[in-house]
Amino acid sequence: MQTPATVPRIFSQARRRSRWQRAAARQGTGHAAGFLFEILAEEIEDRLGFIRHEARTGLLIGDPSGQAASLLEPRIPHLERASPAVLDEEAVLPGRYDLLVSLGLLDTVNDVPGALLHIRHALEPDGLAILGLLGAGSLPALREALYLAEPDRPAARMHPMIDIRAAAALMQRAGFRRQVADHFPLKVRYGSFDRLVADLRDQGLTNALASAPPPLGKTALERARAAFLARADADGKVTETFELIVLTGWG
C-alpha cells in the first residue's frame, strides 16, 4: 500500500462525498433514477443465495438509493451503513465484519490497492466482501460527445476506470484468500444528452476529479448534445453502455 504522500491524487475526496450526498438527496425525492443500484442489489442477492454465506455483522458502504440496505437488513442482524468517507485513503474501516459491501465507490478511490487491503483487514475469518463498481467499458457515447464538444482543447471530463483484468489482479494482490471478478454490460436507451447526465447525477456518478475542468460553455454544450444524438438509431434514441464489475473476495 502506498503512503498518503505518494498516492497520486486523481480524485477529490470532497467532490466524491459531495456527489454522493447530492445523490442521496435526489434519491429521497422518489423520482430519481436508481437502476444501477437496483441491478447491483440483485447481484448481491444472487451471490448471497448461491454462496449461502451466513453473516451476523455487516458493513454497507455507499448505496445512496437504499436498495441494497433494504435487501441486507432482514438478513444481517447487525448491519452498519457508512458514507464514502470510510474508503478515503487514510481511513481505517471501523470494525470487523462477516460481510462487507461497497457499491459505486471503488473506482473513484485514489489508492485502490490500499482500499482493498483495508477491506480485507476489516473482514472476520471467512468473511465475505462484495464490491460493485463501474468498469472501463462504461459510457462510450458520453465520452465521444464530450470529446467532440471541445475538439481543439478537449478537457479531462471523464474518470479513468478499472478494467476487469486489473480488478481481478488487484483483488489477488490485496491478499483475498479466494476471489471472483465478474462483469457484464448494461445497455440503456436515451433520448437526450441531458437525460443521461441527470441519471448520472441521481446515482452519484458525476465528475469527482481533483483537477476539475470548468463547466461546458453554451456552445460546447450544444455540440455535446448534437454529437450524442448523432449516434441515435431510427427511433431517435442513443444506446449507452454501463459496464458493471462485481468483485467477490473471502478474507
Residue ranges and their predicted role:
Residues 89-100:
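A short acidic, Gly/Pro-enriched loop at the edge of an enzyme's catalytic core
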Residues 65-76:
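Conserved SAM-binding loop of SAM-dependent methyltransferases across substrates and taxa
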Residues 34-57, 67:
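Conserved alpha-helix/loop element of class I SAM-dependent methyltransferases that forms part
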Residues 113-128:
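A short glycine-rich, Lys/Arg-flanked "PGG" loop and its adjoining helix->strand segment in the class I
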Residues 1-42:
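N-terminal, positively charged/glycine-rich alpha-helical extensions of SAM-dependent methyltransferases
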Residues 102-105:
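A short beta-strand submotif of the Rossmann-like class I SAM-dependent methyltransferase core
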Residues 32-33, 184-251:
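Conserved Class I S-adenosyl-L-methionine
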Residues 130-193, 206-214:
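Conserved catalytic/acceptor-binding region of the Class I
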